[in-house]
Amino acid sequence: MENRLRDTSRVVRSHAAPLNEVTQEDLKVERLHGRKYMNPSKKHVMREEFSDKIEHIMHDPRPQEGVHSELPVSISPLLCELAAPRQRIHFNPPETVVGIVTCGGICPGLNDVIRSLTLTAVNAYRVKRVIGFRFGYWGLSKKGSHTAMELYRTSVTSIHRYGGTILGSSRGPQDTSEMVDTLERLGVNILFTVGGDGTQRGALKIAEEAKRRGANLAVFGIPKTIDNDLSFSHRTFGFETAVDKAVEAVRAAYAEAISLNYGVGVVKLMGRDSGFIAAEAAVASAQANICLVPENPISEDIVMALIQRRFETSRSCVIIVAEGFGQDWEGGTGGHDASGNKKLTDIGVVLTKRIQAWLRKNKERYPNGTVKYIDPSYMIRACPPSANDALFCATLSTLAMHEAMAGATNCIIALRYNSYILVPIKVATSVRRVLDLRGQLWRQVREITVGLQDDVRAFKEAEVRRELEAISLVRERLIGQLSKL
């Protein structure tokens, strides 16, 4: 079906140059000058994991075709800096004050990040203080700075058992000068910003203002995007948990749909611009018949045709729809939220109403047709992380603390090809990762969902083959019985 196979690149433009314009110089991580202090973990310093050498991995390990040499040549010339604990560090631990702020929507793993940052700062480095700023960047503003709270080992010990963030969160920018004033007044040397694109762009402004003032401040981002749409990263914290919980919602929709005569289950999942959660939930559950994602815009007529095609072979249909799909169906809501994100039409509600109207229109063909709608978004965002996500949060946070203590600044930490890398904030927020409709994940989705070309014919051909095989078995049995007479 041509309507479902729109071409797309792996990233989309977002506020800056596209990925193919990124240079090696753009990927160079900024570091505060001077490393005159020894890492306090002296008994581990001589081990391999502590190194002052900056190592790299290839941005893309695939070799160029047609290039013949002793060593393969990557299709991308870019290299990414590996994150690691450093033997010599920039900040003197007993004099260092660490700040942590969480911004934007909540996500599984936020408390794990806060906990791991605090425990690494206190246990491994024995820093002077760890300060948590309340309710996002508002907590750094003149009006909100009085709400700052000190974090201790005892105050974060059990917070990883719960969803949300103990520091609170908020959306929207604050005055950069005011925020840097607060950091200077409290003597903060390292600020960890945990949040999405908007948060990290705010962190970039803080880093630039601190640099302009000559402040000895490292600003380090830990990206929070449940949609898994961060460029240069193959996984963000909370995504695995989101897929796991999304599958539970799909199974519930399936149970509802198969219990009805022409039942349709609709599940709306997160994914403003990228449909990774929807696609992975479809593949993992193996119970979705239609998967609608922003990268593959199709019309209402096509969606109804897909449902009709499904009903030709079954009396139930399960649809997964990402929240960013179909924003042109009603002309969009217009405007932006406090974080600068475009306000979205509630496509789950819109789609449900359109399907209900279509079923009423075709009630003679599909008697008792019913739609059940499930939106698990806030339940998913609010739950604690899976064990694997918790481990991932701990690793991200620990390495972030090590690199920040060594003076890395104006950058984020990310996972790429199973390696932890540092990426300058400006580059990391310049492009957004999206589903590749020619890639493996979307191919898997298409293999298990309804299409408009050959699905019914293949189903009917399979039925005919089964009938012919049954007839053949009966024939052979009769021949065998006759031969004994």
Curated annotation (Swiss-Prot):
A Gene Ontology BP annotation from the UniProt entry: fructose 6-phosphate metabolic process
Motif (Peroxisomal targeting signal): 483-485
Site positions per UniProt: Important for substrate specificity: G198
Subcellular location: Glycosome
UniProt note on regulation of activity: Allosterically activated by AMP.
Keyword Transferase belongs to the record: yes
Positions with a binding annotation for ATP: G105, R171, G172, G196, D197, G198, T199
InterPro entries to which the protein is assigned, alphabetical: ATP_PFK, PFKA, Phosphofructokinase_dom, PKF_sf, PyroP-dep_PFK_TP0108
Pathway annotation from the record: Carbohydrate degradation; glycolysis; D-glyceraldehyde 3-phosphate and glycerone phosphate from D-glucose: step 3/4
GO cellular component, one term: glycosome
Residues at which substrate binds: T225, I226, D227, M270, G271, R272, E323, Y378, M379, I380, R381
Keywords: Allosteric enzyme, ATP-binding, Glycolysis, Glycosome, Kinase, Magnesium, Metal-binding, Nucleotide-binding, Peroxisome, Transferase
Residues given in the record as Mg(2+) binding sites: D197
Principal subcellular localisation of the protein: other
Record GO terms (molecular function): 6-phosphofructokinase activity; ATP binding; metal ion binding
Quaternary data: Homotetramer.
Stated role: Catalyzes the phosphorylation of D-fructose 6-phosphate to fructose 1,6-bisphosphate by ATP, the first committing step of glycolysis.
Protein family membership: Belongs to the phosphofructokinase type A (PFKA) family. PPi-dependent PFK group II subfamily. Atypical ATP-dependent clade 'X' sub-subfamily.
HAMAP family given in the database record: Phosphofructokinase_II_X
Protein name: ATP-dependent 6-phosphofructokinase
Organism of provenance: Trypanosoma cruzi (strain CL Brener)
Lineage: Eukaryota, Discoba, Euglenozoa, Kinetoplastea, Metakinetoplastina
